[in-house]
């Protein structure tokens, strides 16, 4: 990892926050929109969704009241529309208190988030890393991280999650930063 950090040098971490919502609901909406899409496609659909609501992320009640056909026309799949409505419904009903998440442990945050349809461990990890700014998150299910570790460590294939946990043990308590370097290494290869 040290040679990777030396090769890449200092990172502009503020660059990674550009375009990301400041509020928890907006961050989760953006995560759902971006699932299984390229960064460019995710950004386009997210911007179309925001445009439906006056160039902002709609509050939960507005998202629940939105016309499904308009949401689909913005580029959301039927499944993602369901996920966003489940998220909005849980926030609106108080079943998911987004304001309390900052005071919970990483595991508690993840458990709360994965109770929402369409939010899995990867989404919880991204939320912890980039919205709650938690310093020691390792998204073992992220294929980009696994591929970057494969390349950086000269492995014959991407390590499975358990092996990745072992390899990443020396990075504690800064695994989030290590992951940012790993993602950056993939970008610099392009």
Language-model features, listed with the residues they occupy:
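Mid-sequence acidic-hydrophobic segments that form the walls
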Residues: 52, 87-94, 112, 116, ...
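C-terminal end-helix/capping segment
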Residues: 58, 141-169
């Amino acid at each position: 990892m040290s040679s990777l950090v030396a090769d890449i040098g200092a990172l502009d971490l503020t660059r990674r926050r550009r375009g990301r919502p400041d509020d928890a609901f907006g961050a989760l909406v953006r995560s759902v929109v971006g699932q299984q899409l390229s960064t460019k496609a995710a950004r386009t659909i997210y911007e179309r969704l925001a445009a439906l609501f006056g160039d902002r992320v709609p509050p939960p009640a507005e998202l629940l009241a939105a016309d499904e056909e308009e949401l689909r026309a913005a580029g959301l799949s039927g499944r993602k529309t369901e996920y966003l409505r489940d998220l909005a419904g849980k926030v609106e009903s108080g079943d998911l208190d987004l304001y309390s998440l900052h005071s919970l442990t990483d595991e508690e945050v993840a458990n709360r988030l994965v109770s929402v349809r369409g939010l899995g461990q990867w989404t919880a990890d991204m939320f912890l890393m980039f919205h709650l700014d938690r310093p020691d998150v390792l998204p073992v299910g992220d294929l980009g991280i696994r591929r970057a570790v494969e390349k950086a460590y000269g492995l014959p294939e991407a390590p499975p999650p358990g092996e990745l946990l072992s390899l990443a043990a020396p990075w504690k308590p800064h695994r989030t930063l290590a992951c940012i370097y790993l993602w950056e290494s993939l970008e610099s290869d392009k």
